[in-house]
Amino acid sequence: MVENSIHETPDGSHPDKPATAFTPLLTTHDWNEEWKELQKARRAADDASHWDKRAATFGSKDAPNPYVERFLDLAGIRPGESVLDMGCGTGALSVPLGAAGHPVVAADFSQGMLGVLEDELAERGIVSVTPKLMSWEDDWAAHGVLHDSADVAVASRSIATADLKDSLMRLTDAARRRVCITLPTGGSPRTDERVLTALGLQNQLGRDYLYAFAILAEEGLKPEVSYIESARPDTFDTPEEAYETFSRMVDDAVGSLVTTAERDAALARLRPWLADNLVENPRAGLPGRKGEPEKRLALREPRKVSWAFIAWDK
């Protein structure tokens, strides 16, 4: 009798038969390229001239201190360590770091923001912070930011670039010991996800922190993630101002992803939602986050922005 040369396993399968092909996206997908594709549908990042104009409304004194304190606590910067603060703005991190004696290179692409920072440093007599006009896309080496040029590199709420991986790797290259960044967990710090949900809209853009984590892991790094909650108490003089503000938010968040009919239907729901959620602001006239007087109306529940704090050691 001739024995069958093909043997079956107890479950009836053939051990020498190829398994069904399977490609795990998590470990094979190019997350940076997908992130770039998403950017095509997002609102364009503000340029340097925009931030130059806004600089007058900013100041490190007016920075949200709970956010800054939490960032610095999580960063774990050691006494005397040097810091690269990329996208420093008016110095929300650079000023307290400089006041604590850290040598800081404070880089930003807005001369207006750096001007406010320089005034603050002069007023407080801080000499260990060096402002530097430099963008994410510039040749950092040409600006003196070389490999391992700082003990710690930070980018607080400032990664608004065309290439997420390139920005993350630039920070990694510049740091000797540690890198710390924050990215919004939602679509944008300008977006109130509650409003979008109430209007029947879904923001499919953003979630940059998930892409950053995946990119860093692909590069063999071990990112750690924590979260910082930051309140944004928006105020308005009139219901119409609130309507116009949130209409712009809708267009920025999902304008390229919905039809005109869907947009019009969402905005039709906005006025009733505002009627239910706008209240008299008990802090009207008092200094707000940026030092300007708060306006007459506010949302019943202030908007909250959740930031993902991502750090990795080298």
Q: What is the predicted function of each stretch?
A:
Residues 3-76, 178-204:
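Conserved class I S-adenosyl-L-methionine
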Residues 87-91:
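Class I SAM-dependent methyltransferase "Motif I" SAM/SAH-binding loop
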Residues 95-139:
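Class I SAM-dependent methyltransferase SAM/SAH-binding core
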Residues 154:
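A conserved beta-strand element that flanks and buttresses the S-adenosyl-L-methionine
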Residues 160-172:
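A short, conserved alpha-helix within the catalytic core of class I
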Residues 205-220:
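Short alpha-helix
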Residues 227-314:
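Conserved Class I S-adenosyl-L-methionine
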